[in-house]
Amino acid sequence: MHTVAIIGSGFGGLSAAAYLAQAGYKVTVYEKNKQLGGRASLLEDSGFRWDMGPSWYLMPDVFAQFFADFGKDIHEYITLTKLDPSYRIYFKDTPDLPTGRDHMLVDVSSDLERNSSVFEALESGAMATLERYLARSQYQYEVAMRDFVPKNYDSVFDFFTWKMMTEGVKLNVFSNMDSYVRRYFSSPEMQKIMQYHVVFLGTAPKDTPALYNIMSHIDFGM
């Protein structure tokens, strides 16, 4: 039996360990902390508990598939409660603010209908535009999850296949989020709302491949 050592007990390390053990390997996971590490970490002090991991539960289909791969139903282990609104965006020095106001707050819901009046106030026709934007986002998400995300990239040449080149154009991997969003929305506020997800990547919209617009489908469509 082959043995494998995994450094770090975050979700990546734990999932890798589970798949390797299922495949017949003897697996040992090493973690420097007293509790699970990375995004799976938990801080407990004075009777309080803080999740040290992700603030969003993204790509629920991936989590469900992981449990299914081991013959388990994810809903037997966790119960999810959807937040509404999902998040609040703070706009500073926005034009056309009421007298005496120096900022604007926008609550964003995963329920598109609840966003309608707010988005339309920010940009006329925003909801119709958003429907087109999300339809494209859903298509790109489905293509990415079917053809690219599950693939192993063992060599740099794996990135230069004919399929990668042709589908890459459709997935907008050669443009950035800033220019992509501007094609659809004209108001700075709507542009920032659609680019909000980029903060989780720790980079600027101009430096982020437009492929990441798939996060809008995850946000509003899942």
What spans do the regions from the language model cover?
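A short, structure-level motif marking secondary-structure boundaries and short turns
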Residues: 1-2, 48-50, 161-164, 222
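N-terminal glycine-rich phosphate/pyrophosphate-binding loop and immediately adjacent elements
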Residues: 2-143
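Active-site-adjacent bridging/hinge elements
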Residues: 32-33, 209-215
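Glycine-centered flexibility motif
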Residues: 38, 53, 77, 163, ...
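Rossmann-like flavin
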Residues: 93-209
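Helical element adjacent to the flavin cofactor pocket in flavoenzyme catalytic cores
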Residues: 214-222
